[in-house]
Amino acid sequence: FMGDLKEQAENPEQKVQCGITEVDDCMVVGFKPGTLTLSVADVGGGKSTMMLNISFGLFKKGHNILFLPLEMSFEEIFKKFLCRETLIDFNRFANPAMLTDQDWECLKSHGEVIKKFQQKFLWADVKSRPTVAEIKRAIERKLKYFQPAVIVIDYIANIKPDAGSDNWLAIG
């Protein structure tokens, strides 16, 4: 044990952090490979927004992200990313006719980040209320050509249990 402890002290593991101080401070070891981290809140409690912000933060730190939205379209996710990145009011993305000339210039100036986003932040399309097996297959299809540091599934309540299994056990 002492030898392992000394080795860990001399060669500490790099934590995968998202850049949100409150989250990084709570996640003592960061997002470690092979771990399952659950974020919970009441309906309308901001889980999806929080997971998107964590994912965007991880992406901005150079990590590949695989996002499985079980209730939100990728178009909506991308609009939220653009809003966060450019600080343009989300209502103008929701109604693009409201985007100003200044907004369009801002979007152009963020072209490189947007291009990088499309290469390092992938999503996997899954049907509404997928089973654990269907989610696993969707992830495995992406793993053939993309190696994510973090996989985000938003959100767990929309997962249907495989026939004859308990949902909580299958998810774990």
Which residue stretches match the model-derived regions?
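Phosphate-binding loop that captures ATP/GTP phosphates
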Residues: 86-115
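Metal-dependent catalytic core segments for phosphate chemistry
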Residues: 71, 77-80, 88-94
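Conserved P-loop NTPase mechanochemical-coupling segment
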Residues: 107-130
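P-loop NTPase motor core
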Residues: 3-76, 84, 123-172
